[in-house]
Amino acid sequence: MIELFSADGWLNQAIVSVNYFTWTYILVAGLVICALWFTWRTRFVQFRMIGEMVRLLGDSTGTHDEGEKHVSSFQAFAVSIASRVGTGNLAGVATAIAIGGPGAVFWMWVIALLGSATAFIESTLAQLYKRRHADSFIGGPAYYILHGMHCKWMAKLFAVLITMTFCMAYISIQSNTICGAMQKAFSIDPTWMGGALAILSLAIVFGGIQRIAKVSSVLVPMMAVSYVLLALVIIVMNIQLIPHVFRLIVENAFGFEQVAGGGLGATMMNGIKRGLFSNEAGEGSAPNIAATASTTHPVKQGLIQSLGVFTDTLLVCSCTAFIIIISGLYVNNSESGILLTQVALESEVGAAGPIFIAIAIFFFAFSSIIGNYYYGEANVRFLTQKPSAILALRVITGGVMVMFGAIASLDLVWSIGDFFMALITICNLVAILTLGKYAFRLLDDYRQQKRAGVKSPIFKRETMPDIEKDIECWGQ
């Protein structure tokens, strides 16, 4: 059984073959084309309105009935960042550099800069088509596919795929990374670590979205700031190498300096793959939490989630990239993933490096497990309201898949993640390309209100009479 889960097992080899075709011939082109279109059509919203994005983090929740529990704009931002800022930032970046060289970082930056416009579109649509659920809101791609495109089978397909992606594949990756880091730093057996992690995960996921939001809003800023500060210290210590680092990134990005992974193709492919895993722009994940926010206009969450892409890739991912490239250990090194990040940091700060990374990755990846679970729960609730289904999801997510990630090989869990990531992204891109025109109209409405002097724009569904019947919220 363990051999089946190994890097050389037939399961991993089969998935790798499928991933190569899907990513090479479909997904990379689709992501770039969509990102360029949304960037152009929104008139570069991700750059022109970055000041508004930051201001909206302090935006108060929209008006609601007394006793209702709604997620604030900042909490929605924190939960989505909790999912984005995780293994992809420490282990994913290291894997991309190990295979594609420093140039992979350039393509991660590109997909983040352009993809933030895609993130704006999907999260704005999630807010537009959100539904009331108990004392909060619920929504996401499954909901805008059903109520916007009126395509029931596609909505159900997406709900199933994203649940499998985040609650199975991605949580396995987070667990695998935590266990690997803890084994290197503290010699803790992965099986024991997996068991402890499962207990902690179950305790959180049984608490519901309000507990998830509260935990994430505390953990995420703390872990992100501490990691960025350490990276800045290392960069300052090696300030004379920074021009060389940028030169390596640019030269390798365009194939001027070949790498073991196969030159320009491997560099671009791995940069885009790991960039998407990290920032989730266009993947259809962040809209699930964006829909839960109580706000006065759908565009507000679109802008906030766009900022999340910048924060994830341009800040946190870049920190890992600079640490690894400065160390030079990505060249002819047998280590990959989180272990490469650990040895790179060890070369800069000594034996404390692997220990710090082990602790950091625990908080990064554990918060991602929390965020990933919510994405799954939101979509299971779309499929069925049976309490037994939610109970099963919590047990499988917090128990079974955490343990699977602890014992499976690094290559297998990443291959499975890439496979499901491709499927949900293709499905979501089709949806947002179809419905994007409504996000454009919402953005125009928001800008017009701002130009008219309205400090906090308000959206009413009657301003879009052609689709008013499809919108449940946003009434009087």
Model features per residue range: what roles?
Residues F120-Y129, A134, L232-L248, F256, ...:
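Extracellular/periplasmic helix-exit of transmembrane alpha-helices
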Residues M1-T87, A98-G103, L433-Q476:
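N-terminal alpha-helical transmembrane segments of multi-pass membrane transport
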Residues F44-V71, T95-V105, A117-M149, Y330-E348, ...:
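Flexible loop linkers connecting adjacent transmembrane helices
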